[in-house]
Amino acid sequence: MHINHISVGNRLLPLSFQCAAGEKVYVAGPNGSGKSTLLSAIAGTLSSREGVKGEVLINETSLLTLPLAEQAIYRAYLCQQSRPAFNVDVFQMLALSLPAGRHVVEPEVQAAVRRVVELVQLQDKLHRSVQALSGGEWQRVRLAAVCLQVWRSLNPYSQLLILDEPAAPLDVAQAKWLYQLIDEMAAQGLVVIVANHDLNRVYQHADKVLLLNQGVLTAYGSADEVMSVENLQQVFETPVKKVAVDGQPYLIFT
């Protein structure tokens, strides 16, 4: 996948990068750095009237030139937290999220739903109204739904999953399930782009890191390359240390 000279007015200055199938790309940066703007621009949810320029190429398909309904064949996008717009139970919500032409009675669909429900631990919530869920429960439903849209066995055209701060409403245990779900989607061959404010999670889970500051691409590459003490101190304007715990590197901000 190639992102070529994507920009959004003065909120996001032109930037380009590319990533391979199955890569997990984490977008990091301070509040207001342009993370959500970048993700929504890649997802095609911003119009040209909002100053969007550039292209997103997926296997030579120019994603942003397609109508939104056609874009949804190739990519799924989870924006930041929203409340349910209507009252259905969790199972119905998941059924509504299936790719066009797929039905819950199909064995392949049932297997995919079982797997994603297991990954985010929704087994006991399937017949509960979405209006009765806590914030963390609703976020897990949203995650399951967006993943079913591009679940590779149900949608062979799917290429890209975009998640904007998906861990924000989740507790520690639920966040663990989220990262397992992201690993599952990447293992299916999708590019997964995630905005995340937890820099230690970014460091531990990313194949590539894209570091933004004030709408400008500061660095792009492996976590070790991008998340250097020098880069992080420059962007976040706070002292940073790297320490090892049981052989695993961690960042400490002081």
Curated annotation (Swiss-Prot):
Residue stretches making up the ABC transporter domain: 1-239
One Pfam family in the UniProt entry: ABC_tran
UniProtKB keywords: ATP-binding, Cell inner membrane, Cell membrane, Membrane, Nucleotide-binding, Translocase, Transport
Entries under SMART domains matching the protein: AAA (SM00382)
InterPro entries assigned: AAA+_ATPase, ABC_transporter-like_ATP-bd, ABC_transptr_BtuD, Metal_Ion_Import_ABC, P-loop_NTPase
Location of this chain's protein in the cell: Cell inner membrane
Binding positions (ATP): 29-36
Entry keyword Transport: yes
One term under GO cellular component: plasma membrane
Superkingdom of the source species: Bacteria
Catalytic activity of the protein: an R-cob(III)alamin(out) + ATP + H2O = an R-cob(III)alamin(in) + ADP + phosphate + H(+)
Chain ranges passing through the membrane: none
Subunit structure: The complex is composed of two ATP-binding proteins (BtuD), two transmembrane proteins (BtuC) and a solute-binding protein (BtuF).
Family as reported in the entry's similarity comment: Belongs to the ABC transporter superfamily. Vitamin B12 importer (TC 3.A.1.13.1) family.
Protein name: Vitamin B12 import ATP-binding protein BtuD
Organism of derivation: Vibrio vulnificus (strain YJ016)
